[in-house]
Design a protein with these regions (language model features):
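N-terminal amphipathic/basic membrane-interacting segments and domains
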Residues: 9-384
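C-terminal motif of bacterial Sec signal peptides marking the signal peptidase cleavage site
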Residues: 4-7
């Protein structure tokens, strides 16, 4: 019976401890994100601290005994007594997240593949680009016009918002593609230049065709080009169209993500071609911090050529925060910093949007941070 008691208690206690520690670490990071948005607003340094290790020791002790029943010995019966103790001794190591490697990742704009990864998780392209893109460059032959994602610059900001709303409307109808541009590279070489061993190696990487008239081999290889957001399947493009788009990509940065909206497909009433330039995580925190003050977003109507937007979802702010002197009563999570409470607004018509925005911010931080070192750095160890 004693063994059974200990066996039942220990897994339950362990499960509760694992969940409690997981909640505590998640809440700590969420609060740090809110604090750093506030720091960005007040132009204070951005800084993060992480939990590098949690080591918890559990001890379970059970005992048993017996005593006479309340009727005394005359009753000839014995009352069993079972007891036990449970002790938890956690050791938590806390380390600052800093150093040149992390700083470079913090300041480096996100590459295009990060945005497409999130798009495939069904995040709203409007939310993604409002948070992650610093500007859109619309191609207006023979050059690009730049429109910055900054509410302070009214004309630029409103064009930026209209472009991302247009893409969002196409996404709402499941007509938005975000795929690598499929490319085919071709080479022609004389047959005499290839030896038998080399020919076998070529066949593993290329499709090979021999032309007996010219005695040459034509080598073809399929490769993935730059990622392109479109309102059509890029696999249906002709080789000439793919090469043309790929030539344009020579001027793009790794943090640029191009789009090509064509007239003969859904959303084609406003054909456009251009590039979004993505931000770094540090810039995202700065953007959200500025939104607390005078550089807040505001309502922008979609373009008249834009198809209907699902549920007319078009919030003024990328992520709305509540700031107060008292703890917010209905917030999912809040943090106190400099005598103010900061929380993501999770009430009202855009509660889901704001939760998605904060979840996106959390994921972007995870994409930015390196593995937290476990040894060899200054740390704080808390032993209970």
């Amino acid at each position: 019976m004693v063994g059974l008691l200990a066996g039942c208690v220990s897994p339950i206690a362990l499960n509760r401890a694992v969940i409690a520690y997981d909640d505590a670490v998640t809440d700590a990071l969420s609060q740090q994100l809110l604090i750093n948005i506030a720091r960005a607003y007040h132009r204070q340094p951005i800084h993060f601290t992480g939990v590098s290790n949690i080591a918890a020791t559990f001890s379970f002790q059970a005992n048993a005994g017996a005593m006479p029943s309340p009727g005394g010995l005359a009753g000839a019966s014995i009352m069993p007594i079972f007891g036990g103790t449970f002790a938890e001794n956690p050791t938590i190591s806390i380390v600052p997240i800093e150093g040149e490697d992390f700083t470079q990742r913090l300041l480096t704009p996100f590459p295009q593949n990060k945005l497409t990864l999130l798009l495939r998780q069904r995040y709203d392209v409007d939310l993604l680009l409002r948070m992650m893109a610093q500007e859109v460059r619309l191609f207006q032959s023979p050059h690009y016009e730049i429109y910055r994602n900054s509410p302070r610059d009214t004309a630029n900001y409103e064009m930026f918002r209209r472009v991302v709303l247009h893409l969002s409307a196409i996404q709402d109808d499941n007509k938005l593609y975000a795929e690598p541009l499929p490319l085919i590279h071709t080479w022609t070489i004389p047959a005499r230049a290839i030896e038998a061993e080399g020919f076998q190696a070529l066949q593993k990487e290329f499709s090979v065709r021999h032309d007996p008239i010219s005695n040459t081999y034509t080598l073809r290889k399929h490769t993935a080009g730059p990622i392109l957001i479109t309102n059509y399947d890029p696999a249906l493009l002709s080789d000439e169209e793919r090469d043309q788009l790929n030539d344009m990509a020579d001027d793009w940065d790794v943090s640029d993500i191009a789009f090509d909206i064509r007239a003969d497909h859904y959303g084609g009433a406003w054909p456009m071609r251009g590039v979004f330039r993505l931000r770094s995580f540090h810039s995202i925190l700065g953007f959200l911090g500025k939104a607390i003050g005078a550089d807040a977003g505001y309502h922008v109507d979609k373009d008249v050529r834009t198809p209907p937007i699902l549920n007319d979802e078009n919030p003024d702010l990328t992520m709305e925060l509540e700031i107060s002197r008292i703890p917010p009563s209905e917030a999912d999570i809040s943090v106190r910093w400099n005598d103010r409470f900061y929380a993501v607004k999770t009430t009202g018509p855009y509660a889901r949007w704001n939760r998605d925005a904060f979840q996106l911010l959390f994921l972007l931080f995870q994409m930015t941070v390196t593995d937290i070192p476990r040894v060899g750095v200054p740390s704080i160890t808390i032993a209970k």
